Every structure is written in structure tokens, then in C-alpha cells.
């Protein structure tokens, strides 16, 4: 298979291309020839919908997998959290690469922690789960939906403060220019009078003029002009200046890995949220590559990309999610972590407003983790998770 080109489908978003690029790099390191094929999905066309709503329909996955099943491409790269627990019969998850940090982060312009956000602060999120977790942890905060990809959401967060600073600097610059004009007119008038006075002490006059200039410079509020200030902004901040969001957000909650992969992690203030209190989405931080079950590319992909530990962890998470039956309809977090002979698995199921919660952390036997995962989910359903999920389905 190494001599045959592998056609790999991906979405065309910045994040998707970066994710696919990681897979391509690994395959090419193994001397495989790879062609990346961009495919537009329903999720790319519907730009005014929340990601949580798009997830209900498999909007980011279906078009890519259709290309695989039709033989147009050999395989497709997905974010594991977007992949439905029921995969078409003709497809197989051929490989699950090493998972990156699955944690969520609180994003603010200045690095404020969740505990320190003032009551009434507006927190934006595109996820039902994240919204419910924030409300459960900090009931006094106002959780609002936010649309767009990773970069768009960050720009919406930064835009209002940047606009205010731009206004402040523009007004100060106008005032300084007006003051300079008045001083110039006053100086011209004084010079006209002094020109007609005999025996004028020229040196004293020049000294006084210099003093006037120093007073004007010292009264300037900003060292930079508005143009110089704008030019000093980062590309992210300059792009944010072009946005005029309907809602002003004080913070966002989003996946750390999305910020990392788009190169934005170090351009904003973040607080990494504990995976114990803010349990991530099933498969968060992981990628997967799907292929036709009968394709000879399956072994090639598995040999080059498979990370066994990640496969076990995300499989345990997906078994719990499938047994719960919530999918993207209800606020559900599931996070599994291999620890020796056990798999520590944390589950949270919330009401949409975060006021009710059913959850548990349990050690699953690595030898029978799928069975244990089903039992964990069944126990949670019996303890009220089923009712929360049904309520969410009714409200959807």
C-alpha cells in the first residue's frame, strides 16, 4: 500500500485542515503518498447555527463519510467528538491517533479565573454541556450561545474592548489635534503682535515658544497615534476589530485543543478547567480516521496512526454515551483515563440549566471495560440520568 496514494478527505475549515495536516505528516513520515481532499459539509454551509445543534445531525461528518463510501476518497479525518456512536455498517474507524489534552478552558481577555468572574458576567459557549457545567459551578453567571469557529468566537470576545479602546484613542487624538490647532493660532497671533514691537528680546521669545511646545507634548494622553496603535495589535486583535458582535461576552468556555491547533492558545488569557468538575465531551481532544471496512487502506492507517491507549479510552467513553442515549441532545460529559489495569471513567449528565446533575466516577476493569461501561451508564440512567436526557430531548 505504501506505493499507492492515499486520498484523505477533510473539511476545509482552519481547524479541520490543521487536524488533517497532523495525520498527513504522520503518514508521510512513514513514506506514504497522501493527497488531502477538501469536502464541504452541511456544518460548513450553515454558518448561523450553534455547533451543539449541528452535532445532532452529524453535520460535520456525514458528507466526508459519504465520499469514503462512494470510493471518491480512501479515508476521512474527523474530530472524534463529532462522530456519532453508530457508524454506518460499511465503514470502520480505521485509526485513532494519540489524543491531545481533552480539557476545556475559560478564555478571557485578561486571564480572569472562573471563580473571579463577577456575578452577571456573560459567558459564551457553543456547547450545551459547557453551559450547564458553568451554571452548575457558578449559578450567578449569564451563559449565552456563541456561533462560529474557534477564531471567530475568540474575535467576538475581544472585539468590544478593542472598539472601546479605539474610540478612546480616537477621541483623545482629535482633542489633541484641536488643542494643537488652537495653540498654533494663538502663537501666530502673538507673533504678529511681537513683530511690531521694537527692542524685542528675541532669545526670550524663542525660549517661551519652546516651552509652549513642551507643554503641548506633555499633555498628550497616548504616546502612539491611532494608526500606530492599530499597527501594534496582533493579527488576531486586528481581525477582531472588524467584528461587531450582537452580544458582549466577558468570557468563553471552549476546548483547549482547538486553541492549540489553531495557534491561538498563547494570544488569550486562559484557565484550564478541571476534568473532574468540567468533564469533557466524549472523544474530546482525539481524532479518528474512517475508511471502508473492506478497504486494504485500513491496515495501512492503523499501522501508521493507531494509539492503543487513546482507542481504549474513547471507546469506553463512546460505550457510555451510546448506552445513555443522549448524543448531542443532552448536556453529557464522559472522560476515561487508562490507569494500569483499570480505566477511570467520569460521567456527568445535567439538566440544560445545570440545576440538576447525575454523575459518578468509576474504575472499569480493563479486561472487560465495555461491559463495565454499559453497567455504569445503566446505573446512571436508573438514578435519574434517563429523565434528564428525556427532558433535554423534549426541550430540543
UniProtKB/Swiss-Prot annotation:
Keywords: Porphyrin biosynthesis, Transferase
Sequence ranges of Basic and acidic residues compositional bias: 162-189
Residue span of region Insert: 159-245
GO MF: hydroxymethylbilane synthase activity
Origin species: Halobacterium salinarum (strain ATCC 700922 / JCM 11081 / NRC-1) (Halobacterium halobium)
EC identifiers of the protein: 2.5.1.61
Listed name of the protein: Probable porphobilinogen deaminase
Textual note on the cofactor: Binds 1 dipyrromethane group covalently.
Region (Disordered): 159-224
Amino acid at each position: 500500500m505504501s506505493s499507492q496514494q492515499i486520498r484523505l478527505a477533510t473539511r476545509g475549515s482552519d481547524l479541520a485542515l490543521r487536524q488533517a495536516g497532523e495525520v498527513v505528516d504522520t503518514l508521510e513520515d512513514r513514506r506514504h503518498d497522501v493527497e488531502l481532499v477538501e469536502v464541504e459539509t452541511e456544518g460548513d454551509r450553515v454558518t448561523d447555527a450553534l455547533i451543539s445543534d449541528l452535532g445532532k445531525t452529524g453535520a460535520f461528518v456525514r458528507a466526508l463519510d459519504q465520499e469514503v463510501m462512494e470510493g471518491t476518497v480512501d479515508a476521512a479525518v474527523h474530530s472524534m467528538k463529532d462522530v456519532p456512536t453508530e457508524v454506518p455498517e460499511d465503514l470502520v474507524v480505521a485509526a485513532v491517533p494519540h489524543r491531545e489534552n481533552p480539557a476545556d478552558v475559560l478564555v478571557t481577555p485578561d486571564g480572569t479565573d472562573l471563580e473571579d468572574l463577577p456575578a452577571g458576567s456573560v459567558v459564551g459557549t457553543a456547547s450545551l454541556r459547557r453551559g450547564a457545567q458553568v451554571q452548575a459551578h457558578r449559578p450567578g453567571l449569564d451563559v449565552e450561545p456563541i456561533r462560529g469557529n474557534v477564531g471567530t468566537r475568540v474575535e467576538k470576545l475581544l472585539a468590544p474592548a478593542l472598539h472601546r479602546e479605539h474610540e478612546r484613542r480616537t477621541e483623545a487624538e482629535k482633542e489633541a489635534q484641536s488643542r494643537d490647532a488652537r495653540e498654533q493660532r494663538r502663537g501666530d497671533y502673538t507673533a504678529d503682535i511681537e513683530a511690531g514691537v521694537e527692542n524685542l528680546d528675541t532669545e526670550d521669545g524663542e525660549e517661551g515658544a519652546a516651552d509652549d511646545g513642551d507643554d503641548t507634548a506633555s499633555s498628550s494622553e497616548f504616546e502612539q497615534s491611532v494608526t500606530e496603535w492599530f499597527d501594534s495589535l496582533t493579527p488576531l486583535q486586528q481581525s477582531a476589530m472588524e467584528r461587531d458582535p450582537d452580544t458582549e461576552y466577558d468570557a468563553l468556555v471552549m476546548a483547549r485543543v482547538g486553541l492549540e491547533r489553531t495557534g491561538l492558545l498563547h494570544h488569550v488569557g486562559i484557565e484550564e478547567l478541571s476534568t473532574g468538575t468540567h468533564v469533557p465531551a466524549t472523544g474530546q481532544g482525539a481524532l479518528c480516521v474512517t475508511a471502508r471496512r473492506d478497504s486494504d487502506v485500513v491496515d495501512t492507517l492503523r499501522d501508521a496512526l493507531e494509539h492503543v491507549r487513546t482507542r481504549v479510552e474513547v471507546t469506553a467513553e463512546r460505550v457510555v454515551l451510546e448506552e445513555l442515549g443522549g448524543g448531542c441532545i443532552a448536556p453529557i460529559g464522559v472522560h476515561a483515563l487508562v490507569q494500569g489495569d483499570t480505566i477511570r471513567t467520569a460521567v456527568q449528565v445535567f439538566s440544560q440549566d445545570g440545576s440538576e446533575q447525575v454523575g459518578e466516577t468509576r474504575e472499569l476493569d480493563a479486561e472487560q471495560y465495555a461491559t463495565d461501561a454499559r453497567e455504569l451508564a445503566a446505573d446512571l440512567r436508573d438514578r435519574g440520568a434517563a429523565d434528564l436526557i428525556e427532558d433535554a430531548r423534549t426541550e430540543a
